[in-house]
Amino acid sequence: MTMSMYSTTDKMKMSAPSCFPGRYSPSYRSSEQMRRCMPNPSIHISSSCDSLESRLLEDASLLCNSWSARQNGDIFAGINDGILSRAEALAAVDIQKHQAQHVHSQMPSQIKHDVMYHHHSMSGPPQRPLQENPFSRQMHHSMDQLDMLDPTGSMTTLAPISESPLTPTHQHLHGSYHSMNHMMSHHHPGTLSGHTGGHHGHSAVHHPVITAAVAAAGLHPDTDTDPRELEAFAERFKQRRIKLGVTQADVGKALANLKLPGVGALSQSTICRFESLTLSHNNMIALKPILQAWLEEAEAQAKNKRRDPDAPSVLPAGEKKRKRTSIAAPEKRSLEAYFAVQPRPSGEKIAAIAEKLDLKKNVVRVWFCNQRQKQKRIVSSVTPSMTGHGSAGFGY
């Protein structure tokens, strides 16, 4: 018996060193002490998750074999089996934890690479490799620097980059963008210009004669004229034109009488569009000095009431207003007597009456016409009053 105990003790001493201090140690140990017994799993981590799992399982199996009751002849085999089951469970937990850390460490970089590939694929298939373009090389280099960030903090540090001050790399990128825009503005000025500029360049084609005429006349228009100034002048021009009694068509025709080099007659629609501000900005600027010159000349002629035969007339040549014809009392009584006999005389009768009274034929004809209208108004004013008295007599 003593011999067998001694041999058992020798076997215990020759076995693997224990992580517990004594033979009759308690059956429960904390997880930290169990981890001290196990080899450090981080030493066995490799690039592949499968090799990591296989090595950890192998270490766990070696630990179980070292604590097997069959090898060291432990009499507390049941207690050791419980401890070994706890150790295996902790090892499995560690394996799952390292797998999760390994997966999370690979996800951000994988996402960033996918974003880069999708960014290049959306813009179409590249005609040349990215390395041939220095601009794309620099962008790729900046993305590689982002990939070198901490995987766990890369998703949070990417967002504030746009809010932070520009780094030298970003400043260089913005400088490249500005240079590209400058180059595009030289090659395609109409594409990068605003809506107003494009509209002006297009609408200037409609009336190129106006701009050429203004340049030939030496009326150098101010290209920086404020639109509000043009609007005020158009309204003032319209009011003064109406006050002078001149139509838009008359203004268009009278522009040819200004004798300005290259300035001819314009259509009524052009003057109308100027007053309604529907012309383009460039055409409004070109037409303003011409209309201003006409307005000053027209107001001067209307004020002076004189027409110089050598000076051009910018106002329409209207007929002189006919004076009102006054008929003397004796002729008037004779006409009334003729009207009482025949309210509608013939043309020959009107000519005979005019010759007898020494009046113009047209004057006699107009007098008979006016007298008929006067009698008609008198009759129409008397008839309703008579109808009213008649209806009242019947009691209606």
Curated annotation (Swiss-Prot):
PROSITE patterns: HOMEOBOX_1, HOMEOBOX_2, POU_1, POU_2, POU_3
DNA-binding region boundaries: 320-377
Keyword Nucleus annotated: yes
Residue numbers spanned by region Disordered: 302-328
MF annotations from Gene Ontology: DNA-binding transcription factor activity; DNA-binding transcription factor activity, RNA polymerase II-specific; RNA polymerase II cis-regulatory region sequence-specific DNA binding; transcription corepressor activity
Keywords, sorted A to Z: Activator, DNA-binding, Homeobox, Nucleus, Olfaction, Repressor, Sensory transduction, Transcription, Transcription regulation
Major location (coarse): nucleus
POU-IV box, short sequence motif: residues: 86-95
Matching SUPFAM superfamilies: Homeodomain-like, lambda repressor-like DNA-binding domains
GO cellular component: nucleus
Function noted in UniProt: Modulates gene transcription; simultaneously generates both a specific activator and an inhibitor of gene transcription, capable of modulating two distinct regulatory programs during neural development. Has a role in olfactory behavior.
Annotated family: Belongs to the POU transcription factor family. Class-4 subfamily.
PANTHER family on file: INHIBITORY POU PROTEIN, POU DOMAIN
Protein name listed in UniProt: Inhibitory POU protein
